[in-house]
Every structure is written in structure tokens, then in C-alpha cells.
Regions:
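N-terminal nucleic-acid engagement/recognition segments and initiation subdomains in replication
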Residues: 1-88, 99-103
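Short secondary-structure junctions
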Residues: 12-15, 155-157, 204-207
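Short, intrinsically disordered, mixed-charge
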Residues: 117, 151, 198-205
Length: 221
């Protein structure tokens, strides 16, 4: 189809597997931008200027097809890292939390490994799932500590805006973020704690949004 060939010649599209957003860049480039309504209209008008009948319907079908590449920002960040130099940085990070729990460092280390494994779609045995609970006075920096656990390029996939009274919202947050912080966990809606534990222990969460659209589990590396 002439319209599809035009798209493949002029731009590269990829789908963010976390947010569901479609990004585009000029063919051969790597400066990906969000495919907004304005960007869609520009593509259609530029195609028409070259005599190509690219319609909004064709573009929409192309965007929501398996012909474009899935992109996992967490995988990209992990792949950009240098080979590990043998330095245990996780222990230093864990020691920023003052605690009397002698197992804290070991458990924190295991939790971080589980978190990164989930980012890449790897299975985590449910009986071994760990969820840290940090307890302390207000203003001690508990939430701030959680916020800096992700590198700057991935911090848009962190949230502490969770309402436990909404199961649908929690489901969506689990599949669209890399790190969730349930702030004031003991202060609000503790009767839903079992549901939260269930959601966070699933190694392959699936969210079905309105109108029957399903976000599938993220693929493994």
C-alpha cells in the first residue's frame, strides 16, 4: 500500500509499552516525540503534498498494529549501562535508611532485584515477593527516598498518587509504572490491604481499560 510505504520511508514509529503512547521520529533519526493529534495531521498533510492519499483511518490502523516496534524505556536504560564493575552500590543505598532491622539490607537488595526483573518481564516467584514498608515520623524523607530510587530518565514512571479505594486505578498504575509508593499506607483504607498485596505480587499484571482495550504483560528481554 502506497500510504504505508510512505510512512515507512519518512518516519519511524514505536509504542511505549508502559504508557501506551506512540512516539515518532524522522526515518533514520532517534529524536522520538509524542505522536500528538497535531503531529498526525502534519504527517497526513505532508503526504498529501507529495500526492500520497494517507488518511486518518489508515494512520490510526497503522499506529494500532503490530507493524510498529514496542519500546520499553526501562530496557533501554538498562542496556545503556556499562558492565558492572563489582561495586555493591545497593548496600550503600539501603544504609541511608536508619533501622534496627538486621535483615533490612539483604531484603532491600532482594527487593531491588525483583523490581528490575519485573521491569523486563521476568517471572518472580510469588511466595518470595518482597514489598518494603518504611515507617517513620512525618518529614523524615521516606517518600523522597522512594522518589530518587529511579534514574532521572525513568522518574516519570514513579508515582505516589494511589487511591486504594479504586481497584481499577491501582491495576492501571501497576502496569504503567516502574515503581509505586503507597504513601501513608497505614492511614488510609487499610481494609483494602489484601487487594493491594495481590496486585503487587502478580508477576504478569494485565489491565483491561474501558471499551475492552487490554494492556498485555510486558514482554521479557
Amino acid at each position: 500500500m502506497e500510504a504505508l510505504n510512505y510512512l515507512k520511508r519518512h518516519c519511524s514509529l514505536r509504542r511505549n509499552v508502559l504508557s501506551g503512547e506512540t512516539m515518532f521520529a524522522p526515518q533514520g533519526g532517534d529524536d522520538y516525540q509524542l505522536l500528538t493529534r497535531e503531529a498526525r495531521n502534519t504527517l497526513i498533510l505532508e503526504a498529501a503534498n507529495e500526492g500520497i492519499a494517507l488518511t486518518d483511518e489508515t494512520l490510526e490502523r497503522f499506529v494500532h498494529s503490530t507493524l510498529i516496534t514496542d519500546w520499553n524505556p526501562a530496557e533501554e536504560w538498562l542496556d545503556s549501562l556499562d558492565a558492572w564493575d563489582g561495586t555493591d552500590r545497593v548496600t550503600d543505598l539501603a544504609n541511608r535508611i536508619i533501622t534496627s532491622n538486621p535483615d533490612w539490607v539483604a531484603l532491600f537488595h532482594k527487593w531491588m532485584l525483583q523490581m528490575v526483573a519485573r521491569w523486563t518481564g521476568r517471572e518472580v516467584t510469588q511466595r518470595d515477593t518482597i514489598v518494603p514498608v518504611i515507617v517513620g515520623q512525618y518529614g523524615y524523607g521516606k517518600t523522597s527516598f522512594c522518589n530518587i530510587l529511579l534514574p532521572p530518565s525513568l522518574r516519570r514512571y514513579y508515582t505516589d498518587q494511589i487511591k486504594l479505594r479504586s481497584n481499577a486505578e491501582v491495576h492501571e498504575l501497576v502496569v504503567t509504572n516502574l515503581l509505586l509508593c503507597i504513601d501513608e499506607f497505614y492511614q488510609e483504607h487499610t481494609d483494602q490491604a489484601p487487594a493491594v498485596r495481590y496486585l503487587l505480587s502478580r508477576s504478569t499484571p494485565v489491565f483491561r481499560s474501558a471499551y475492552g482495550v487490554t494492556r498485555l504483560p510486558r514482554r521479557p528481554m
